[in-house]
């Protein structure tokens, strides 16, 4: 077994987050073994972060207040946001018969190390969250042990909390948070972005220089991706439809063509006016994860 095969084998069997979602490395320079070793170290370090973070994600999703189906996404300068929408009617391609298969999450990598326990507390300026002083609040003990009984410790703003936060921001002459816009179906041409010929799965990369240059996220064709200004939503519907319909498209590279939802169809714009959205190169790791049965 040569070095390249061994590197790939090590990653493929490295304690995946979920058996159906794992990282596949892409070795850029086959002749530079030292570079490959450094790449593996980078992947291992980030994988440890993701696995540690995954426990917190599961805790927060399990502690979600079921009566609150409308989530508000955090501003970009806030700590990482975990979003779970339990109502299948809010998804781009809902499957009402199996709502338990839907699990939505987003990780903002740059904020992984920040304290994310208390940012639904409304008694602070959200713009202070990215400053070091935020870490020295007086109640820095862990909230995990009793977060199940306190909805204010979850990462979700109900209507009252949202109104309070908007009032607070208006008093400080800040732009109030508005609810997220309607979901946009992301449409790409698979043949343009994906080299894998297997019809059951595909790989994608968003060209992040330090991480995704060395591995691709494994995603199924039957996953739908919704795009929001500040976050990416993974809708993992296990409908096992391996067809070429537009709602089975997946993300390719770092250019996304956004299409408005179907309830309000509009004529297609001229080619020179098509809307493209550039994914920021360094802000996000995408970790789709199926809900454990």
From Swiss-Prot:
- Biased segments, Basic residues type: 133-149
Top-level taxon: Eukaryota
Q: Where is the composition biased (Pro residues)?
A: 260-272
Region feature Disordered, mapped onto this chain: 121-154, 254-274
According to UniProt, the name of this protein is Putative uncharacterized protein DDB_G0277161
Organism lineage reads as: Eukaryota, Amoebozoa, Evosea, Eumycetozoa, Dictyostelia
């Amino acid at each position: 077994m040569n070095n390249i095969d061994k590197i790939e084998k090590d990653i493929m069997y490295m304690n995946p987050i979920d058996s159906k979602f794992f990282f596949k490395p892409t070795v850029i320079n086959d002749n530079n073994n030292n570079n490959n070793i450094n790449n593996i170290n980078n992947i291992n370090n980030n994988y440890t972060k993701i696995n540690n973070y995954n426990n917190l994600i599961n805790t927060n999703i399990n502690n979600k207040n079921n009566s609150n189906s409308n989530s508000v996404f955090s501003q970009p300068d806030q700590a990482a946001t975990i979003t779970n929408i339990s109502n299948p009617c809010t998804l781009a391609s809902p499957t009402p018969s199996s709502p338990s298969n839907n699990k939505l999450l987003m990780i903002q990598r740059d904020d992984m190390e920040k304290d994310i326990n208390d940012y639904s507390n409304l008694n602070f300026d959200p713009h202070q969250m990215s400053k070091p002083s935020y870490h020295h609040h007086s109640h820095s003990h862990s909230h995990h042990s009793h977060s199940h009984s306190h909805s204010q410790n979850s990462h979700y703003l109900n209507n009252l909390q949202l109104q309070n936060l908007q009032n607070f921001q208006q008093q400080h002459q800040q732009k109030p948070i508005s609810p997220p816009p309607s979901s946009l179906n992301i449409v790409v041409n698979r043949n343009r972005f994906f080299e894998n010929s297997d019809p059951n799965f595909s790989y994608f990369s968003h060209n992040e220089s330090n991480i995704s240059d060395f591995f691709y996220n494994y995603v199924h064709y039957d996953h739908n991706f919704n795009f929001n200004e500040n976050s990416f939503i993974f809708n993992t519907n296990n409908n096992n439809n391996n067809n070429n319909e537009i709602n089975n498209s997946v993300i390719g590279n770092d250019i996304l063509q956004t299409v408005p939802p179907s309830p309000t169809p509009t004529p297609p714009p001229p080619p020179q006016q098509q809307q493209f959205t550039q994914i920021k190169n360094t802000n996000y790791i995408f970790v789709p994860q199926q809900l454990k049965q």
